[in-house]
Amino acid sequence: MSSTNETNQVLQRLNSLKIVETPKEQHEFGKRECYSLDSKKYSLVPATPSSSGHGKFQTELKKRRKNKLNRMYTYEADKNFIKARKSLNF
């Protein structure tokens, strides 16, 4: 019996809520980092909708990050290989 009462209260609260759209100025101040409202201002945000068409994203940043990671991995691998080579007296 108490659970139905609680659901009724929740439903009443939901009904009393009003849907308000945030003005565009407030959107731009870091509220939504995942995409930009105009891609000219934030041209290199990851997954920014590009001007080349609907559903396409700019991936320059991702590529750059991947290259950096690969560089770090190869450096670590080289370091370990040099250590192993020294221990085996090649």
From Swiss-Prot:
Q: Which residues carry this modification: Phosphothreonine?
A: 22, 48
Look up the record and report any one GO term of the cellular component aspect. Answer: nucleus
Say what happens when this gene is deleted. Most embryos display premature mitosis resulting in defective invagination of the mesoderm during gastrulation. A small percentage of embryos also display an extra nuclear division prior to cellularization.
- Result when mutating residue 86 to A: No ventral furrow formation during gastrulation and reduced binding to CycA
Q: Which domain of life is it from?
A: Eukaryota
Does Protein biosynthesis show up as a keyword for this record? Answer: no
Keyword list (alphabetical) reads: Cell cycle, Cell division, Mitosis, Nucleus, Phosphoprotein
Q: Which GO terms describe its molecular function?
A: cyclin binding
- Result, substituting residue 88 to A: No ventral furrow formation during gastrulation and reduced binding to CycA
What GO biological process terms are annotated to this protein in UniProt?
A: cell division; gastrulation; negative regulation of G2/M transition of mitotic cell cycle; negative regulation of mitotic nuclear division; ventral furrow formation
Does the keyword Cell cycle belong to this entry?
yes
Spell out the subcellular localization from the entry: Nucleus
Quick one: where's region Disordered?
46-65
Q: What does this protein do?
A: Cell cycle regulator that is involved in modulating and adjusting cell proliferation according to the requirements of the developmental program. Interacts with mitotic Cdk1-cyclin complexes to inhibit mitotic entry at the G2/M transition. Likely to function by binding to the hydrophobic patch of cyclins to interfere with the interaction between the complex and certain Cdk1 substrates. At the mid-blastula transition, involved in the cell cycle arrest in G2 of cycle 14 by delaying mitosis and thus reducing cell proliferation allowing cell fate specification and morphogenesis to take place.
Q: How does it assemble?
A: Component of the Frs-CycA-Cdk1 complex composed of Z600, CycA and Cdk1. Interacts preferentially with CycA (via C-terminus) but is also able to interact (via C-terminus) with CycE (via C-terminus).
Q: What is this protein called?
A: Protein Z600
- Organism for this UniProt entry: Drosophila melanogaster (Fruit fly)
